[in-house]
């Protein structure tokens, strides 16, 4: 594991946490799916020594092991004084599951029609600064469209992406932050091997000692 990657990720989290306090007057939110990437982000946030909260979007289709892991992980974090929140999906003002959503949409989600992401996976954090475990190595699309820092306006065409902490567009980015959710992807430049190496070196027991992924 390249320790420079760890330090860069920690610096990004500290920058995001500071910006969150300045612009939103609230702690940074670290989102977690219960998977390997977001679990690394939680561990890095703890190591960074920042003030943060943790949020999980309950998709209704997670494996039981993931649900059990989230419960145990949230118990561990709450015992350390870290606020944790679970968001349950709503559609048209009503609680939904994947199975109740499909009849309303008249089709299951597909690679091209991925309504499940916006309703089940990406809700919450409006008007706040959040982190995700998104990485460029996951797909060509993410390599082309995602960055270290992002704004998430309702119109995707107005999205601003920064890949340099000193980017000339930072002033525009910060202006847009006042109106929209902002995102930091601290491990965006990590490879799959980097993630697994970090888990093995830093949080193996915490993740795998009866907790699952």
Predicted regions and their residues:
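Nucleotide-activated chemistry modules centered on ATP-dependent adenylation/adenylyltransferase
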Residues: 1-213
